[in-house]
Amino acid sequence: PHDDVWTDVARMRTLNGEQQAGGREMHLCPLQFDIVDRAITQFTMPGETVLDPFAGIGTVPLRAVALGRRGVGFELSPRYWRDAVAYLRAEEDRAATPTLFGLLDATMPAAAAE
């Protein structure tokens, strides 16, 4: 295999599983999370904005938010757009929910952490 060909992509890691589980229309060409994650981390820095002009069910904006970026997407299909908004809201809620270890880190004095 060529060094520039990504052969370690998990083809099943897409939003179509969520679509099917929710009884919603599956996307014809789902993007794999591994491909999107790699592109986002290679070409953007945390806090930057990632734009997807053909967002579909929102994989790129969703993964951008999950990776600490801002995600923006445009979509013509109202059904896909509604699904994408739901995924993004859920991811924002997940990211805003504190974890036990995060709370401990926030409350522990710096000297005690050493």
Language-model features: locations:
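S-adenosyl-L-methionine-dependent nucleic acid methyltransferase catalytic domains
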Residues: 1-114
